[in-house]
């Protein structure tokens, strides 16, 4: 069982909500620091979905194609607030910092049908 799979299972049990991990093909992250930062980004995004978004259905997805790795965390909560850039919270800043540290990009978007999706892309 991968660390992300174990984490989503623990979140599901602890909070009584749907938190799933999907990974169609095994993804090899050969640098421990990169794997740690990806894990922590997922952890922060899931925490935000529960704490701020009220998400009851969270999907953590990891994929790799052509040497690129993508980690996405999607929830069905209230969505990203309009004033998120002015937020005093550190969570988004820390996720951005972690992504930049490993040479990745981080995108946080409000979904048209509600909820938020956080995507970390690493080339």
Language model features with spans:
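Coiled-coil dimerization/phosphotransfer module
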Residues: 1-123
